[in-house]
Regions:
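Bacterial N-terminal signal peptides that target proteins for export
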Residues: 1-13
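Outer-membrane beta-barrel proteins
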Residues: 45-49, 99-102, 130-136, 177, ...
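Surface-exposed strand-loop-strand hairpins of Gram-negative outer-membrane beta-barrel proteins
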Residues: 43-72, 194-197, 405-406
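N-terminal periplasmic/intermembrane-space "pro-region" immediately following the signal or transit peptide
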Residues: 25-51, 421, 426
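Outer membrane beta-barrel
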Residues: 31-37, 41-45, 65-189, 203-207, ...
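Outer-membrane beta-barrel pore domains
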Residues: 47, 110, 224, 237-426
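Transmembrane beta-barrel outer-membrane domains
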Residues: 67-71, 101-106, 157-159, 199-206, ...
């Protein structure tokens, strides 16, 4: 839901919607288009004590090996052209997520105004323009891969922004280019595997800037996102843990209290800012397809996932079949948090508490590489069958993209992930 600060924006949005609806009967064009998409995908990974996640906003389950949940979804979209300048768009997606309420299943909901051939203004809920697949992340049929590379798209779990989107499009000779600016509010609910707590991370002051171009077979982009003034609403167990750390920091127990004070400072991210930089390059000539993105995530606190990563995908179409290969990685920009003293010397309970807190901070630590082979078979103009094999090398403690508890996430391992998926549009 939008915060109190955005209620004036929400009221103005509803007022504008009412004006548009009241005037639609006299519009020169009044067309409604319905469309949809979906995927039925089964994924299986070969490790018994960790669980695969398509992205970290999905409910974690370390006991799960094979499941239809992570890579299956169903979406519908309504586009209402009120006239040649004004239109309405709404999109709803059912998929595996922590909370299945109407607000969360609403991926898009905006009014669009096209004053001329260059400007494009949208107000409402739009896709966060932080990566190449900003408007099609959920539409697997639109992409060669089974799923977007986990190292990038699994770590950035903010899919949409509630606010204003302004885009300017033009061309220079044969180069088409556009620049866009977004400003508004974002929020996401995630679940803690250890405590089953639901926590909400939100920001009312998120800025996204993107530059994009295409030239014949080539396309490229640059984007910057500043998620400012983060607010985190913790679940009851996480709140109790934070209170315990604060009390220990003030208990005057020497090294243990000093370490607790540092842990509290690094785990309290309210008011912090997270910044994302991204560059992308693509090529498609009808036969060969290449796509690549590089990104960097920066934050001041150790509880924030941060580092650099990217991927390179290459595929070649052979009639109805397109085999492809992908290499992707995430390199952390911070060190693993380790115990600086032994709280167990004070009491066994404090020793267990120390391990729990440190594993909680390290649960956001990402360090992995993935090598993928796959094939897409277009059996129909609106249906594709895909198979993909992922070989994932996870380094020590680097399980931030997986469902894993403190015991299963200490040592690195190699994981094999197999996926068969049917994607469709209508």
């Amino acid at each position: 839901m939008l915060s109190v600060a955005f209620w004036p924006f929400r009221l103005s949005f509803l007022t504008l919607l009412g004006l548009l609806l009241s005037s639609s009967c006299t519009a020169s064009a009044n067309e409604v288009a319905f469309s949809g998409f979906g995927s039925v995908g089964y994924s299986y990974e070969n490790e018994p004590d960790i669980g695969y996640l398509r992205n970290i906003s999905q409910p974690p389950d370390v006991e799960r090996n094979g499941s239809f949940l992570p890579d299956s979804n169903f979406g519908v979209q309504v586009d209402w052209a009120l006239n040649y300048q004004w239109s309405l768009t709404a999109q709803w997606v059912l998929e595996d997520r922590v909370e299945q309420d109407f607000n969360n299943v609403t991926e898009l909901s905006f009014i669009r105004y096209l004053p001329d051939a260059n400007w494009d203004l949208r107000i409402g809920r739009v896709g966060l323009n932080a990566y190449t697949a900003a408007d099609s992340r959920r539409i697997d049929y639109a992409h060669l891969w089974v799923r977007p590379p986990q190292e990038l798209y699994g770590s950035i779990f903010y899919d949409s922004i509630d606010g204003l989107d302004v885009t300017y499009r033009s061309s220079i000779n044969e180069v088409n280019w556009s620049a866009s600016l977004q400003y508004g509010a974002i929020s996401q609910v995630i679940e803690d595997e250890r405590t089953k707590d639901h926590s909400e991370a939100s920001s009312d002051h998120t800025l996204a800037i993107a530059l994009m171009f295409d030239y014949h077979e080539w396309s490229g982009r640059f984007s910057f996102v500043d998620v400012a003034d983060l607010t985190v609403s913790l679940g009851p167990n996480s709140q109790q843990a934070q209170l315990g750390i604060a009390q220990l920091a003030q208990a005057g127990l020497g090294a243990a209290s000093l370490e607790a004070a540092e842990i509290y400072a690094q785990s309290n991210i309210n008011g912090e800012s997270v910044k994302y930089w991204q560059v992308g390059l693509g090529y498609f000539d009808g036969e060969w397809q290449m796509q690549s993105e590089l990104f960097y995530v920066a934050g001041m606190k150790q509880a924030i996932p941060q580092g650099s990563g990217g991927y390179l995908m290459l595929g070649r179409s052979i009639h109805r079949f397109t085999p492809y290969a992908t290499v992707s990685f995430f390199e952390p920009a911070r060190d693993i948090v380790k115990a600086q003293s032994d709280w167990g010397l004070i009491s066994p309970q404090l020793g267990q508490f120390q391990q729990l807190i440190i594993s909680g901070i390290n649960s956001t630590y990402i360090d992995q590489d993935t090598y993928s082979l796959g094939i897409r078979w277009d059996i129909h103009s609106q249906v594709a069958i895909k198979g993909q094999f992922d070989y994932i090398q996870i380094n020590d403690v680097g399980y931030g993209l997986w469902a894993a508890d403190g015991r299963s996430s200490t040592q690195g391992r190699d994981v094999q992930l197999y996926t068969l998926s049917v994607n469709f549009i209508f």
